[in-house]
């Protein structure tokens, strides 16, 4: 009996996502189940470039980057569920609905990103996503991603 891998390290993540520093927002996948859910982490470091301007006197991780981390997690789940990208394919972040930011995320926090696959139609996949810090929801949203050739 073989056990299918349910985690991903940074090397495996970079094989699926085109993003690189400073825009790669997923450090590790701690679990996933194809066509169902994926849980990932993003370690928030004061050394990230966005903190030089957002905000120097009180560094806060931008909410739009939390959404980007969720979108990258949905791309990973989609590729693991429906096949790895060909050399000229990407998952584009297509839309976000019902985004709520509940608490600031600051350097030193570890974002735990949980995404749930809902459905796929004509190459557009729908997901629910939440991001947590210390078990507390800091952001939630509905996301859609489109698999397209470039």
From Swiss-Prot:
Subcellular location: Cytoplasm
Domain of life assignment: Bacteria
EC class name: lyase
Covalent S-S links between cysteines: none
Catalytic activity: a (3R)-hydroxyacyl-[ACP] = a (2E)-enoyl-[ACP] + H2O
Molecular functions (GO terms): (3R)-hydroxyacyl-[acyl-carrier-protein] dehydratase activity
GO terms for biological process, alphabetical: fatty acid biosynthetic process; lipid A biosynthetic process
Keyword Membrane: no
Active site: 54
A GO term from the CC aspect: membrane
Keywords linked to the UniProt accession: Cytoplasm, Lipid A biosynthesis, Lipid biosynthesis, Lipid metabolism, Lyase
Pfam families attached to this UniProt entry: FabA
InterPro entries, A to Z: FabA_FabZ, FabZ, HotDog_dom_sf
Enzyme Commission number(s) of this protein: 4.2.1.59
Summary of the function given for this chain in its UniProt record: Involved in unsaturated fatty acids biosynthesis. Catalyzes the dehydration of short chain beta-hydroxyacyl-ACPs and long chain saturated and unsaturated beta-hydroxyacyl-ACPs.
NCBIfam families, per the entry: fabZ (TIGR01750), PRK00006.1 (NF000582)
UniProt similarity note: Belongs to the thioester dehydratase family. FabZ subfamily.
Protein name: 3-hydroxyacyl-[acyl-carrier-protein] dehydratase FabZ
Lineage: Bacteria, Pseudomonadati, Pseudomonadota, Gammaproteobacteria, Vibrionales
